[in-house]
Amino acid sequence: MSGTQSTITDRFPLKKPIRHGSILNRESPTDKKQKVERSSSHDFDPTDSSSKKTKSSSEESRSEIYGLVQRCVIIQKDDNGFGLTVSGDNPVFVQSVKEDGAAMRAGVQTGDRIIKVNGTLVTHSNHLEVVKLIRSGSYVALTVQGRPPGSPQIPLADSEVEPSVTGHMSPIMTSPHSPGAAGNMERITSPVLVGEENNVVHNQKVEILRKMLQKEQERLQLLQEDYNRTATQRLLKEIQEAKKHIPQLQEQLSKATGSAQDGAVIAPSRPLGDALTLSEAEADPGDGLCRTDWSSGDASRPSSDSADSPKSSLRERSYLEEAPERSEGVQDAEPQSLVGSPSTRGAPHIIGAEDDDFGTEHEQINGQCSCFQSIELLKSRPAHLAVFLHHVVSQFDPATLLCYLYSDLYKQTNSKETRRVFLEFHQFFLDRSAHLKVPVPEEISVDLEKRRPELIPEDLHRLYIQTMQERVHPEVQRHLEDFRQKRSMGLTLAESELTKLDAERDKDRGTLEKERACAEQIVTKIEEVLMTAQAVEEERSSTMQYVILMYMKYLGVKVKEPRNLEHKRGRIGFLPKIKQSMKKDREGEEKGKRRGFPSILGPPRRPSRHDNSAIGRAMEIQKSRHPKHLSTPSSVSPEPQDPAKLRQSGVANEGTDTGYLPASSMSSATSGTALSQEGGRENDTGTKQVGEASAPGDCLDSTPRVPTTVFDFPPPLLDQVQEEECEVERVAEHGTPKPFRKFDSIAFGESQSEDEQFENDLETDPPNWQQLVSREVLLGLKPSEIKRQEVINELFYTERAHVRTLKVLDQVFYQRVSREGILSPSELRKIFSNLEDILQLHVGLNEQMKAVRKRNETSVIDHIGEDLLIWFSGPGEEKLKHAAATFCSNQPFALEMIKSRQKKDSRFHTFVQDAESNPLCRRLQLKDIIPTQMQRLTKYPLLLDNIAKYTEWPPEREKVKKAADHCRQILNYVNQAVREAENKQRLEDYQRRLDTSNLKLSEYPNVDELRNLDLTKRKMIHEGPLVWKVNRDKSIDLYTLLLEDILVLLQKQDDRLVLRCHSKILASTADSKHTFSPVIKLSTVLVRQVATDNKALFVISMSDNGAQIYELVAQTVSEKTVWQDLICRMAASVKEQSTKPIPLPQPPPCEGDNDEEEPAKLKVEHHDLSVAGLQSPDRVLGLESPLISSKPQSHSLNTPGKSAAEHLFVTATQFAKEQHANGALKEGDGGYPVTIPGPHLPVSEERWALDALRNLGLLKQLLVQQLGLTEKSTQEDWQSFSRYGPASEEVQADSGIRDLENVKACHAREGQMSFKTGTGDIATCDSPRTSTESCAAQDSVILASQDSQASNVLVMDHMILTPEMPPAEPEGGLDESGEHFFDAREAHSDDNPSEGDGAVKKEEKDVNLRISGNCLILDGYDAVQESSTDEEVASSFPLQPVTGIPAVDSSHQQQHSPQNVHPEGPVSPFTPEFLVQRHWRAMEDTCFEIQSPSCTDSQSQILEYIHKIEADLEHLKKVEESYALLCQRLAGSALPDKLSDKS
């Protein structure tokens, strides 16, 4: 018997299953060798030596009586097959012959012994092998031995009986006691004549059949009476079964009485001295089976009155059970194993099977194993049920059977799990799209259509389940009947194993574990059948596999979820995890009531009888023995154990359920499987011996497990979550997933394992808060407060679930991979980063939330704002922010490393798969668990916003909102860190793919710099595809990277990113190529919009190698806007960082304290100007001049210590720029707009030459009016003007400076235009604005930095007469009426409104201008020569001559030269040095022409100058148009026709 388990797998391929059948269905009582063993000591006299017979004598007597003949027949298979059935082993007999079938036509008779099949000797073969040979072709040649045609039928037992001990045939069979003898046993001490014995056996059969028919009729009558009183589906089903069975019994009885004249039965005798133990079906009150045991020492028989029970028919049939090999195996085992109460024993009735009805073949199977009679009996026998499942899955649609079993599973599920199991039941069997759809009654389907399944109450659950089970039961019974027929033909699986299990079950209650082990092997066969399903049936097969494994797990079978099912679950969204399906109740008493098979230390999956008193004693013993903490490892085993092999549940020894055992009792458990037989089962005492090996229902492997109490998780994490009591599955040995195995419950323990703590958070949805509080409390709360409490509960619950997820990541992945050394420490750090810190933070946060919950005993939390602020602001915010940023920013690297290592390292790949299959992971992969930290951070602000939404008390609401804002700050910080990390990772990838092999020194001078380009040293701001439009016919697809200081233009080729220089032929120089760099430095970049394409932009690079214009086209307008904005901002940032302060001379101490602030202020102002000088429209127009925003504006004109000249020039410069801007905004109507990117509003380009002409016209009109004054009024005007000398000086300065700046601007423009048209020397690619803006910036800085000692300053209009330097008129602002502004109100009105306004009013009222000759005549001054000499002008002029502004202060010329300000860079026609020289000469030529106000030819001279200015401005306009045309040519676009014609 010990070798039975080890040979199961070897014997699975149907090698030698044994034929079993009921005697009731046989024609003669000569089937199988167990006839010898059927008679117990009640039938034999052990001292009778005459009972021994030899095989030869038996054959001789048989031949003499019957005269057997041997013949050969050839059978041709027809539409109904061969028309015969065979049975028996060694040899095989013809069981039945179908009337008018192929076998009957060939001459085969019932009872013929098959000698050969197609010439192959089969006398020592079993019936399965014979069936295979017969089915090998459409013809079969049989050599049979039997009675001659026309002679009486031969009992099968004659030629089949074979002693089990000696191996010889014995023709004598003992005569069993008659059923009516009531215990008086008749001993057979001598051989009985064959004819007489045959008659005795036949009479017994007839009597038994009559009695069975009578009992069945009585039972049918009782059932009908019960059904009339209470009509139930179950009673109706039993009535139908009884009505079906009665005709079968009547037919058998009629055949038996009609064949009384047939031959006799030879009863074999038993050798002396053999102790015979006959194991019949076991009377088990748990599963309803009636079995008997007889021993050779019994002196009497139990009465047959036990058949009067409601299951009498089953008992009658179980008495006739035959098992030839089982009895043989039992003899080799223990001869005494009595199981069951004597009251359950019945008298054995041995009868002959002389009828030839093959239609009742299933009764033979029932005679062998009554559990196949009904599904109710079968579902408690794991191995038998597994064989039946294999048959149904292979031959039929198993939906109805699985529906029946899952309904039964629902009934056995505890109340906590019923709703979930019903939802699964609905998804599998009732739903429209269910893969195992079964017919649903109309009333149920209508109800399911009306409401959602999760909203159906539990009472309806039970009703639906019961209705569906009754609905599918008839179909299940039909499958069972077909199975019995197939089994009779030997076409079912594991026949010999089931036979041995039945034999061992009678003598050893521990065989239930062997049944489970056998069922486990059969389940693998079922999985193989399901694996072969078509691809379209894959999901259906997975669902069937899930249901089967669920039910087998419920029966205690060790099931292992296959890898393919785990993978399929990802595609089958509805498929739930098996691990949760059977949460058993922990109370032993409740389990005893529900199942009748209580387990003290485990779930009720090991059926056995129970003793309530023993359960109570066990409870007391367990409570007294249970340790508070885990026992030490030293008490378990002296050998060290691999931590990876330890179960997380604690103790595990071949499925041992003693999760917590005293240390002193563990030594006996180390023997593994070498335990006593009694230790492997549950005794009637109800207690398990400490150290015994329980049923291997938990263990998936056959190797013994060394028990241990070492727990894998560190002590700080052992008691995190202990509010609820629940079960989880063990983490498998070596990380192997065991999805279907759960931890055995620890019914009386005070502490929980870490896995049980994890189970607390396995629910995806938080529990309803309203279920946690009393109804009285709920009635006293407002609806808003109830919702607030629910959100708070969700916050607490999800935090606990997140802690559990982090623990899974730590324990299932990090700790294990660290222990097993799969990854190096550096790789561990890259993947798991600072997981310990994150876990510690959230564990602490979870503990604080628990404290808040405990503080509010009613579960209604009043104030939480202060707690939230503590958690998410201050130190808590900083810790969480930085820790989360470190962890989350590492995600891209971690996921990339996991992906790459799984491809390269098979060991790591296997580990990850095993760990991900762990039920604790809830079907999440490692790459899904790592991002949960980021997901948690996004949930905080949402939850806090909802709490604030439902909070009515304003102070509390504000606190919660403030905490929510802090959570957003944390999230933003982490988001930024993640973006930067992702960008860094992408840059590293781009750097690896960067290809610089196409760079050639001949194409680009700085090729070495490009070859050494390192993208990883910079931060990436933006990336994306752009198209570079080189010209009209050529465009290049680019992948552009905007880094913090450069713009990189790459080309994608295969997997490479190519860095390449491109060139094009310029229109001006057709014989040469212009090379463009693929890397653009943002410090020299200007951005402009393309007028003809709203998806394109110009990027103008002012590099040392010349100006380069790139026309880049985005895919959409919005993308272009993003690119333009980001490039402008980054360019401004780079310029701001690279700008160095300009050294300015320190003012003398006498200038006052305010002067000390000037250099620093000007540095900052110049710094701001240089950052975005060409991108801010305000700066372009001069509105944001440093002088406007500087502190000197706040000083009045009469501030002590300040020279009047400094204020004059400050005022003049500001006024000139303001008027310039105003004029541009009011009068500008340029023909080609320019969009200036940046954060400010765009400004259109203006035609400055046109503006100058308009302003000149207005000036001409004004001067004509002023010169119209009579000669005689000149002296009076001078006298009147003398009272306003200081103010007049300012007015003069305003006018003069404006004129000079216009001269400077014109010079700059002319120089640039000249180059573009071929007249200049140095190339530039600036816009018309660029020179003006640059000069304005330099003028502002240098003007403000000058310091003058003079008090009287005369600034004169300077007209340049040379055509190379055309003069410019003042670009002062004009209002709509055409009046010219000469005041400087804006320079002082902001800070000194009183003084500024007063001075302005006086100036407007009293100032009169006079012009005489080449000079401006200032009214009110007595002597003209004070301002007309060269010496005075040179000594009093305080300005540094820069950028076109004439300066005559020779004493300061060297000290404040432009070289001191801008020492580096080449000298161009637009530099201060060049312009100063030319203006200085012009000053020398004109300063001596200043005459007194009395000159009479002044009018004609002014008109002459105006005429020259007009001519020069006309020329400037043409140059400007030519420049615009050239710019458009370079950009690949054409100007309108009118511009081309003008050029």
UniProtKB/Swiss-Prot annotation:
Q: Which residue positions does N-acetylserine occur at? A: S2
| Modified-residue entries (Phosphoserine), positions | S41, S309, S341, S637, S1288, S1327, S1377, S1457, S1540
Which residues are connected by disulfide bridges in this protein? none
Sorted keywords for this record are:
Acetylation, Coiled coil, Cytoplasm, GTPase activation, Guanine-nucleotide releasing factor, Membrane, Phosphoprotein
Q: Which residues form a coiled coil?
A: 194-262, 981-1004
The UniProt record lists the DH domain at 787-977
PROSITE patterns in the record: DH_1, DH_2, PDZ, PH_DOMAIN
* GO molecular function per UniProt: G protein-coupled receptor binding; GTPase activator activity; guanyl-nucleotide exchange factor activity
Q: Where in this chain does the record put each PDZ domain?
A: 72-151
What residue stretches are annotated with the PH domain? Answer: 1019-1132
Q: Where is the composition biased (Low complexity)?
A: 293-312, 663-676
Q: In which tissues is it expressed?
A: Expressed in brain, predominantly in neuronal cell bodies.
Task: Fill in the subunit field for this protein.
Answer: Interacts with GNA12 and GNA13, probably through the RGS-like domain, with RHOA, PLXNB1 and PLXNB2, and through its PDZ domain with IGF1R beta subunit. Interacts with GCSAM. Found in a complex with ARHGEF11 and ARHGEF12; binding to ARHGEF11 and ARHGEF12 enhances CDC42 GEF activity of PLEKHG4B, and PLEKHG4B, in turn, inhibits ARHGEF11- and ARHGEF12-mediated RHOA activation.
Compositionally biased spans, kind Basic and acidic residues? 28-45, 313-329, 582-592
Superkingdom of origin: Eukaryota
User: PTM Phosphothreonine: at which residues?
Assistant: T736
InterPro entries in the cross-refs: ARHGEF12_PH, DBL_dom_sf, DH_dom, GDS_CDC24_CS, LARG_RGS, PDZ, PDZ_sf, PH-like_dom_sf
Keyword GTP-binding in the entry? The reply is no
| Main localization (coarse) | cytoplasm
The record's gene field reads: Arhgef12
What is the designated name of this protein? Rho guanine nucleotide exchange factor 12
Where is this chain compositionally biased, Polar residues type? 1450-1460
Source lineage: Eukaryota, Metazoa, Chordata, Craniata, Vertebrata
Q: What does this protein do?
A: May play a role in the regulation of RhoA GTPase by guanine nucleotide-binding alpha-12 (GNA12) and alpha-13 (GNA13). Acts as guanine nucleotide exchange factor (GEF) for RhoA GTPase and may act as GTPase-activating protein (GAP) for GNA12 and GNA13.
UniProt-listed Pfam families:
PDZ (PF00595), PH_16 (PF17838), RGS-like (PF09128), RhoGEF (PF00621)
Q: Does the keyword Cytoplasm apply?
A: yes
